Amino acid sequence: MISVSEAIQRLSSSFSSVDIEEVPLSQAAGRVLSKNIKSDINLPLFTNSSMDGFAVRVEDVEGAGEDQPVILNVVEDIPAGKRPSNKIGKNQTARIMTGAPLPEGVNAVVPIEDTDQYDSGSRSQSHLLPAEIKVYRSVSEGAYVRLVGEDVTSGEVVLEPNSRLRPQDLGLVAMLGISQISVFRRPRIIIFSTGDELLPVDVPLQPGKIHDSNAYTLSALISRDGGLPEYLGIVPDQEKAVRGSL
């Protein structure tokens, strides 16, 4: 008879390194990363708005309030996915959507809720581009602006080896434009159940017998932790039978 710790040591010493494989990003959930993932780009890639609203120069809306709104001329509409075409000058603004690039000349965004373009009753905004707007609140420089590289900088390691890939990790990798990931192969693990008292689950119980339940528990645990279980049945309580199965 050997101790549990010695048995674990013997088993561990017999294991070989798990191979590495490349898998598509769509099949990488739950897999274990084998090497660093480094970003080649900044995220965001461009300075953009974090709110639907109006891109402004901070100095133009200084002192704006409910009783003393600032009036700005609207010179452009910038939905998400469009590149700005105008430089915003004094007392000018551009309507901008969340995620859209900031135009040249501005340094903040006023949320649409702080302008006369927001209908508080319907909690919506007009799709028509106004010629001018009223701004009811001042903002500080950088307000509602996401800067280049604010989340991830080019050259930054975003995921390290031996980490299990979660859904949010795959989303991040997709944002970096990476379609293939290097992961460890899933280890194949053989399961035997030992015991003269065991019966397969589809066989009716007899006196002194029990169903083989551990095989299903172990298979589920192995699958959950990333392995590939393979159940090879029940082995009787005989040394020769156990050795032969191994």
Task: Place the predicted regions along the sequence by residue.
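Short, low-complexity N-terminal leaders and the immediately following helix N-cap/first helix
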Residues: 1-66, 95, 107, 126
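Generic structural signal for individual residues within well-ordered alpha-helical segments
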Residues: 8, 29, 116, 171, ...
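Short, solvent-exposed polar/charged micro-motifs at secondary-structure junctions
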Residues: 31-36, 145, 241-242
